[in-house]
Amino acid sequence: MKKVIFSGIQPSGQLTLGNYIGALKQFGQFQDEYECFYCIVDEHAITVPQDRLKLREQTRSLAALYLAVGLDPEKATLFIQSEVAAHAQAAWILQCNVYIGELERMTQFKDKSDGKAGVSAGLLTYPPLMAADILLYQTNLVPVGEDQKQHIELTRDLAERFNKKHADIFTMPEVFIPKQGARVMSLQDPTKKMSKSDANLKNAIFLLDPPATIRKKIKSAVTDSSGIIEYNKEEKPGVSNLLTIYSVITGETIANIEEKYVGKGYGDFKTDLAELVVAELEQIQERYYAYLESEELDNILDAGAEKAARVANKTLKKMENGVGLGRKRRK
């Protein structure tokens, strides 16, 4: 029996090369080995204010990108969170089994609420919904970045608490972090993670950036004054970040890349890297635009929601029975 992978991405902002290398690129590889559920978590997105038309546009766009990067709907399940009602229902049950202190300690809540006068309750109770997303599918592995590990730890705590207190129904999920490429850094400030929400657009390469923009961003990426192309994350974070991108896209080891560019300068290296990134993303963009307005995309999402609901509803029913919700029917 295959192990289960669950992964969710919010449909907010354009996806970056960092999202692709850190998560999306691996999705096509996972689907042959695991039972994969890929969820567009639009209910998470509304924990902060959203424009309703833009949110729907970004949700569809993200679904098309999932398929464009190689997700096969015959092998993996792609669906939209809000189209499977069990997520919100299970989240409420888990919310009643989590403590306020646990939620207030979440680093992401502290970061997003810091200095803001009006913070939604949804931002505080985000973790139980994330836990529901994962636990409904009896998930074994959750591919996440380092910044999400705290949420997975809370998910495990909630699963263990529910199993002991109510009913032993949840599989304990494990964090799965790819060994390389899990953390692509900002092009202008390589001490920070590349982010789709960064105000400075030069910091990130977006998956739908045109070729000229990609080349310009890579050529202007921060390096250092040594001119030597070698990996040293502490002393040469900019070059190290570019080497990581090169390595993940080509499959070459960083040592081989370093050897290839002995005696060459940053200009040659950046030019070559830019062309590699352009070639990689042009293929994705072509497939993306073919899917975006197609009836096929709607059919794939409908089928994905139906399959996800069948699995999730089984777990939800066990949760409801475990806490005593609903009624026991008489004959």
Swiss-Prot record:
UniProt-listed GO biological process terms: tryptophanyl-tRNA aminoacylation
Subcellular localization, as worded in the UniProt entry: Cytoplasm
Principal EC category: ligase
Gene Ontology molecular function: ATP binding; tryptophan-tRNA ligase activity
EC number: 6.1.1.2
Residues spanned by motif 'KMSKS' region: 193-197
Keyword Isomerase part of the UniProt annotation: no
Superkingdom of the organism of origin: Bacteria
A GO CC annotation given for this chain: cytosol
A Pfam family the protein falls into: tRNA-synt_1b
Keywords: Aminoacyl-tRNA synthetase, ATP-binding, Cytoplasm, Ligase, Nucleotide-binding, Protein biosynthesis
PROSITE patterns found in the cross-reference section: AA_TRNA_LIGASE_I
Residues holding ATP: Q10, P11, S12, G18, N19, G145, E146, D147, V184, K193, M194, S195, K196, S197
Motif ('HIGH' region): 11-19
Enzymatic reactions: tRNA(Trp) + L-tryptophan + ATP = L-tryptophyl-tRNA(Trp) + AMP + diphosphate + H(+)
Positions contributing to L-tryptophan binding: D133
Major localization listed first in the record, in broad terms: cytoplasm
Similarity section: Belongs to the class-I aminoacyl-tRNA synthetase family.
Complex formation: Homodimer.
PANTHER family noted in UniProt: TRYPTOPHAN--TRNA LIGASE, MITOCHONDRIAL
Function: Catalyzes the attachment of tryptophan to tRNA(Trp).
Protein name: Tryptophan--tRNA ligase
UniProt lineage: Bacteria, Bacillati, Bacillota, Bacilli, Bacillales
Gene: trpS
